[in-house]
């Protein structure tokens, strides 16, 4: 199945602790149906000291399930994603709310 949410997309969290927060997807894990969104679902992790890194407690992003996030449309509201095949045979993602193409 084609990916509805991809790296670089601006998304909004639909439910959970971070509901309503927006961020950019910087990693997608299709096998787990999860994505990492910058600044969303932050957790504290204990980092052991190494030669290159200092030890201590660091904050990092935890994966969010794809069903809990939606792409932000041009109007700033969450939208579902559909697909459209153009005349030249290329498949593009389309915002269901507005009908606008998401990627060119």
From Swiss-Prot:
Keyword Cell wall biogenesis/degradation carried by entry: no
Could you state one GO biological process linked to this protein? translation
Q: Which Gene3D superfamilies has this protein been placed in?
A: 2.30.30.30
Among InterPro entries, the record links this protein to: KOW (IPR005824), Rib_uL2_dom2 (IPR014722), Ribosomal_uL24 (IPR003256), Ribosomal_uL24_CS (IPR005825), Ribosomal_uL24_KOW (IPR041988), Translation_prot_SH3-like_sf (IPR008991)
Subunit (UniProt): Part of the 50S ribosomal subunit.
Query: What does this chain do?
Result: One of two assembly initiator proteins, it binds directly to the 5'-end of the 23S rRNA, where it nucleates assembly of the 50S subunit.
**Protein name as annotated:** Large ribosomal subunit protein uL24
In its UniProt entry, the species of origin is given as Nitrobacter hamburgensis (strain DSM 10229 / NCIMB 13809 / X14)
> What lineage does UniProt assign to this protein's organism?
Bacteria, Pseudomonadati, Pseudomonadota, Alphaproteobacteria, Hyphomicrobiales
Gene coding for it: rplX
């Amino acid at each position: 199945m084609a990916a509805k949410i991809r790296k670089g997309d601006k998304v909004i969290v639909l439910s959970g602790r971070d509901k309503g927060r927006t961020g950019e997807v910087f990693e997608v894990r299709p096998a787990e149906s999860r994505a990492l969104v910058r600044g969303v679902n932050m957790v504290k992790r204990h980092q052991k000291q190494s030669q290159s890194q200092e030890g201590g407690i660091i904050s990092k992003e935890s994966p969010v399930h794809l069903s809990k996030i939606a792409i932000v449309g041009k109007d700033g509201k969450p939208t579902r994603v559909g697909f459209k095949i153009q005349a030249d045979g290329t498949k593009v993602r389309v915002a269901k709310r507005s009908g606008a193409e998401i990627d060119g």
